[in-house]
Amino acid sequence: MTGIIAHRGYSKLFPENTMLAFKEAAKFDITGIELDVQLTKDSHVIICHDETIDRTSNGSGLIKDMTLEDLKSLYFYGKFKGQVEENADIQIPTLEEFFQWFKPLDIMVNIELKTNIFRYEGLVEKVNELIQQFDLFDRVILSSFQHHTMNTAKKVNPKLKTGLLTVSGTLQPGNYTASHGHDYYHPFFMTLEAEDMENLTANKIGVNTYTVNSTEDMKKLIDAKVTNIITDDVALGLQVLNASK
């Protein structure tokens, strides 16, 4: 059965990658949450999609040049400025803070490591330490567009579940993913073809597609039997999924 993963939390209705968006998503019968991590100047693992905070907060600058204290002084309301209360739930969360809240829940989390532009040396190791600290290996999937980052993750700890993100698709994606020792393939949904699903299924590779926000596209992917659909619209995803049963 296909599951629904909340992209950056319930990001259609709440500020992305905030505890508010995560808590609102968890009120629904979701399979999991997707989020993005980066490293601060003082080496804290924080949750944010962009390398800069300009789009999502009332501040400006690169995350790598700011301390956690700098970042915690800001509010990450994004496009919802004036629509949400300025409190701790829309301050930037650390991955540790997220795990403290997440640990008692019965859902999984997909953590994208944002190593596309900056390498963030030590990020993989710090994320692994936090997963180990909270004993969450069976509930976490790491993913990245930088496949060497996922190769590093498997070397750091073979227990880590890893997924390969792609924008334009991959020839024989099941063979490719399996040959590199990874567990999941995360394609942009429009690039996923029937023969890709056959190849992935034959190699026992899970398929988590992003970012799917229309009823028609969700129906097609449910029919294709993808593992999970990553969506901004949690309510729509569950509505379409339940109607397909």
Pin down the residues of each PLM region.
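Phosphate-group recognition and catalysis centered on beta-loop-alpha active-site segments
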Residues: M1-K245
